[in-house]
Regions:
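Short N-terminal targeting/anchoring amphipathic segment
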Residues: 93-112, 123-130
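A short acidic, amphipathic alpha-helical/loop segment
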Residues: 115-119
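Short, well-ordered alpha-helical microsegments
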Residues: 50-51, 111-114
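Short, hinge-like loop/turn segments at secondary-structure boundaries
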Residues: 58-63, 122, 144-149
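N-terminal subdomain of nucleotide-sugar transferases
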Residues: 1-60, 98
Length: 169
C-alpha cells in the first residue's frame, strides 16, 4: 500500500455527458491537478451505469459506483434533476472508505454522504463536507410538482391543508 495519504471525494451524482455544474466542477478540479506533482492520492467517487475506475493521472482516479436506487427511476414523476442514489447506504462504498485518511462529501443528504458518516464513525476517519446545492429547496420544489399531479382533492389536502412539501423538505 502506498505511503501517500488518500483522500476520498464523494460527489454522489452520475458522471455522464449530461452531468450538470456540480459534477463539472469536480471534473475541472481534478483536471487542474493532472500535471501537478501530488504527494496525495485523490479519488473522486461518482455514480454511473456500472462500477468502474477511470485513471485520470498517477494520483487521481474516478471510482464509479452503480446506485442502489437511482433517482432516475422517478423521472416518470417529472423529476429531472441530476441523478443521485436514494438508497440509505452503499455497503461496497462503506468498506472501500476504510482505506482513506480523509473523506470529503459534497452533500449531506444522499447515499454517499450517509455512507461516509457511518464510515467515519466506524473507522475514525476524519470527515469534511462542502455545501453546493440548496437541496431542501429542490426537494420542496419536486415534492410540490409531484403532489400537483394527484387528483384535485388530494392535491388540496396534501398541499394546502397538510403542507406535505414543507414537512418533507
Amino acid at each position: 500500500m502506498s505511503s501517500r495519504k488518500k483522500i476520498a471525494i464523494l460527489v454522489d451524482l452520475e458522471l455522464n455527458d449530461q452531468s450538470g455544474g456540480h459534477v463539472k466542477f469536480w471534473e475541472r478540479i481534478s483536471q487542474s491537478l493532472v500535471k501537478k506533482k501530488l504527494n496525495i492520492d485523490l479519488v473522486f467517487f461518482f455514480l454511473g451505469k456500472k462500477k468502474k475506475t477511470i485513471k485520470v493521472s498517477e494520483n487521481i482516479n474516478f471510482h464509479i459506483y452503480k446506485p442502489g436506487f437511482s433517482s432516475s427511476n422517478l423521472s416518470f414523476l417529472g423529476i429531472d434533476a441530476d441523478i443521485t442514489d436514494l438508497s440509505p447506504i452503499n455497503l461496497g462504498l462503506l468498506f472501500e472508505l476504510r482505506h482513506y485518511n480523509l473523506i470529503h462529501t459534497t452533500d449531506q443528504l444522499h447515499c454517499m454522504a450517509k455512507t461516509a458518516k457511518l464510515a467515519s464513525r466506524i473507522w475514525k476517519t476524519p470527515l469534511t463536507t462542502s455545501y453546493h446545492t440548496d437541496t431542501p429547496s429542490y426537494t420542496e420544489y419536486y415534492i410540490l410538482e409531484i403532489l400537483k399531479k394527484l387528483p384535485n382533492f388530494l392535491d388540496k389536502l396534501f398541499i394546502k391543508k397538510l403542507r406535505i412539501h414543507k414537512r418533507i423538505s
